[in-house]
């Protein structure tokens, strides 16, 4: 049986680079949420917006808002007024993780509490219809270091320097 030559991968990279030179830059596709553009969503009344979001969010919005959420709505309106005047809106800090992101919140920066700190998130079009809590995870990936002295049975007999 004859051995096949292993592919080094160098030739393919050159071909890809040539192809990239000939291709025109990609145009950004206009954002649509369930068939509606961002401008249409922002003009839409909240009752109509509730009809197009998923059932979990629709149920949360139908229950009404708590006093803490009402305070957040007031902060959003104040920040929106500042941005309309041309001033830079500050970060809106909140503990309300169960608040549904509405189209009027797009473009604002939120400090969402994750149980330890406020994660600063600038809301973009793709976040419409999600919860604020989805943007700031409460659990991070743990990367452990090497075990300490006496942590394992094998390290009992290793001389300490």
UniProtKB/Swiss-Prot annotation:
<dbReference type="InterPro" id="IPR020934">
    <property type="entry name" value="Ribosomal_uS19_CS"/>
</dbReference>
<feature type="region of interest" description="Disordered">
    <location>
        <begin position="1"/>
        <end position="26"/>
    </location>
</feature>
<dbReference type="GO" id="GO:0000028">
    <property type="term" value="P:ribosomal small subunit assembly"/>
</dbReference>
<keyword id="KW-0699">rRNA-binding</keyword>
<protein>
    <recommendedName>
        <fullName>Small ribosomal subunit protein uS19</fullName>
    </recommendedName>
</protein>
<comment type="similarity">
    <text>Belongs to the universal ribosomal protein uS19 family.</text>
</comment>
<dbReference type="InterPro" id="IPR005713">
    <property type="entry name" value="Ribosomal_uS19_euk/arc"/>
</dbReference>
<dbReference type="Pfam" id="PF00203">
    <property type="entry name" value="Ribosomal_S19"/>
</dbReference>
<dbReference type="InterPro" id="IPR002222">
    <property type="entry name" value="Ribosomal_uS19"/>
</dbReference>
<dbReference type="GO" id="GO:0019843">
    <property type="term" value="F:rRNA binding"/>
</dbReference>
<dbReference type="GO" id="GO:0006412">
    <property type="term" value="P:translation"/>
</dbReference>
<keyword id="KW-0689">Ribosomal protein</keyword>
<keyword id="KW-0687">Ribonucleoprotein</keyword>
<feature type="compositionally biased region" description="Basic residues">
    <location>
        <begin position="1"/>
        <end position="19"/>
    </location>
</feature>
<dbReference type="InterPro" id="IPR023575">
    <property type="entry name" value="Ribosomal_uS19_SF"/>
</dbReference>
<comment type="function">
    <text>Protein S19 forms a complex with S13 that binds strongly to the 16S ribosomal RNA.</text>
</comment>
<keyword id="KW-0694">RNA-binding</keyword>
<dbReference type="GO" id="GO:0022627">
    <property type="term" value="C:cytosolic small ribosomal subunit"/>
</dbReference>
<dbReference type="GO" id="GO:0003735">
    <property type="term" value="F:structural constituent of ribosome"/>
</dbReference>
């Amino acid at each position: 049986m004859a051995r096949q030559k292993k592919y080094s991968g160098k030739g393919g990279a050159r071909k890809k680079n040539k192809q990239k030179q000939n291709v025109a830059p990609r145009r950004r596709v206009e954002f649509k949420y369930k068939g509606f553009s961002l401008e249409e969503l922002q003009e839409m009344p909240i009752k109509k917006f509730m009809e197009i979001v998923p059932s979990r969010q629709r149920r949360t919005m139908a229950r009404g808002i708590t006093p803490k959420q009402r305070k957040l709505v007031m902060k959003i309106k104040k920040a929106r007024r500042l941005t309309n005047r041309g001033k830079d809106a500050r970060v809106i800090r909140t503990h309300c993780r169960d608040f549904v992101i509405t189209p009027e919140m797009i473009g604002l920066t939120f400090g969402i509490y994750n149980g330890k700190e406020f994660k600063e998130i600038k809301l973009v079009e793709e976040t419409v219809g999600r919860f604020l809590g989805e943007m700031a995870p409460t659990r991070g990936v743990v990367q452990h270091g090497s075990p300490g002295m006496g942590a394992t049975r094998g390290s009992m007999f290793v001389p300490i320097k």
